[in-house]
A protein has these predicted regions:
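Rossmann-like NAD(P)H-binding beta-loop-alpha module
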Residues: 152-191, 201
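ATP-dependent carboxylate activation and anion-phosphoryl transfer catalytic cores
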Residues: 2-7, 13-16, 36, 279-364
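ATP-grasp fold ATP-binding core
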Residues: 150-151, 179-198, 221-230, 234
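Structured adenosyl-cofactor binding patch, chiefly the S-adenosyl-L-methionine
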Residues: 144-153
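ATP-binding N-terminal substructure of ATP-dependent carboxylate-amine bond-forming enzymes
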Residues: 1-135, 139-141, 145, 164-177, ...
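Hydrophobic beta-strand scaffold residues
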Residues: 41, 128-129, 157, 187, ...
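Phosphate-binding site of ATP-dependent enzymes
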Residues: 201-288, 311-317
Length: 364
């Protein structure tokens, strides 16, 4: 029996992307910090194969992957029918049970989760959800589209170009020649649609460039090439939409040539400095560009805007926007918000309020 006094919040986690493991940990932060006096919490895991299971797993079981084997898991779907406005559960006894859902937290990273696909389903269902909408989620996920929009908005960015699989397969040497001529060495090679530094390589010569392209194509059908920026990485948390509010940036002290997936989530060698080691004027400049980029790409709810600050020139250049940033214990977004005076439980409350307010404005 659902409580009429509490909001029913569904936390989605897992997914079919290469960032499945990170999502499980991020979702655990929400599960552990949602106020049970205010919310009825349901957790729904999406396996790597794409099965949706309603589970009573703890955050520890979610993180280590053992949640999938729990005997109480029930297959479920989000109904696109607005009359249902929620979940459909398929019980072990063969019954079909409908649950009203007030808001969804899509704690999903990468493709088939952070790219607007799940958001479109929730829009069809008329269910409020935390974070950016369909358009912003899709364009921020595609680095080539995002870069083009940054250029159009006048937000500084390093030199770049992109190529699709068919272009590469038909003329690999021509694609390499174009990238070398425009960008010089070294070149960062990235899948257009991936996050958490998955599939990214720093190429120093032609052989490495070809290997990097092959790796990127394992993760996406489109490849982005970017000129190397000799600088350090800083990140801003942005929240809201009317107006967007950016925090003071924090700084990543990476343990490798660039901020790798392992640095972020496995080997623990990266460090975070808040605020970033910049002048007050430069801190404000980063904040300004973060709010500009967030607004230009139609972001709502929350996002993390990542920048480079070039050594020597001190020039600020945007790298990318993450529309559902990590919420792991080492993730920058919650650390930045806490530094501004908003601890995780209060942050979650605010994000839910923003989700409900957006739906109210859209649909009345």
């Amino acid at each position: 029996m659902q409580s009429e006094d509490k909001l029913c919040v569904v936390v989605l986690f897992g997914g079919m992307s290469s960032e499945h493991e990170v999502s499980r940990v991020s979702a655990g932060t929400f599960v552990d910090n949602l106020d049970r006096a205010r919310y009825e919490v349901l957790t729904v895991g999406i396996t790597r194969e794409g099965r949706w299971l309603c589970t009573e797993a703890t955050s520890a079981q979610m993180a280590d992957g053992s949640w999938e084997e729990l005997p109480g898991n029930m297959p479920c779907v989000i109904s696109p029918d607005r009359a249902d406005h929620g979940m459909i559960l398929f019980t072990p006894s063969g019954q079909v049970e409908k649950l009203h859902v007030d808001v969804v937290i899509p704690a999903l990273h990468g493709l088939w989760g952070e790219d607007g696909t799940v958001h479109g389903l929730l829009e069809l269902a008329g269910i409020p959800y935390v974070g950016c909408g369909v358009l912003a989620s899709a364009v921020c996920m595609d680095k080539a589209v995002a870069n083009a929009l940054f250029d159009a908005a006048g937000i500084p960015h390093t030199k770049w170009l992109s190529a699709c699989r068919w272009e590469i397969e038909s003329d690999l040497d021509g694609v390499c020649d174009g990238a070398i001529a425009k960008l010089g060495w070294p070149i960062f090679v990235k899948p257009a649609n991936a996050g958490s530094s998955v599939g990214i390589t720093k190429a120093h010569d032609r052989d490495e460039l070809k290997q990097a392209i092959a790796l990127a194509l394992e993760n996406d059908h489109k490849v982005v090439f970017e000129a190397f920026v000799d600088g350090h990485e800083v990140e801003c948390a942005v929240i809201g939409s009317d107006p967007a509010v950016a925090t003071r940036p924090g700084e990543i002290l990476a343990g490798a040539e660039f901020y790798t997936y392992d640095d972020k989530y496995k080997n623990g060698v990266s460090q975070v400095v808040i605020p970033a080691r910049l002048s007050e004027e430069k801190l404000d400049e980063v904040k300004t560009y973060a709010a500009m980029a967030y607004t230009a790409l139609n972001c709502e709810g929350l996002a993390r805007c990542d920048f480079f600050v070039e050594h020597g020139t001190n020039r600020v250049m945007i790298n990318e926007i993450n529309t559902f940033p990590g919420f792991t214990p080492i993730s920058m977004y919650p650390k930045l918000m806490e530094h501004e005076g908003t601890p995780v439980p209060a942050l979650i409350d605010h994000l839910i309020e923003l989700a409900l307010e957006r739906t109210e404005k859209q649909h009345g």
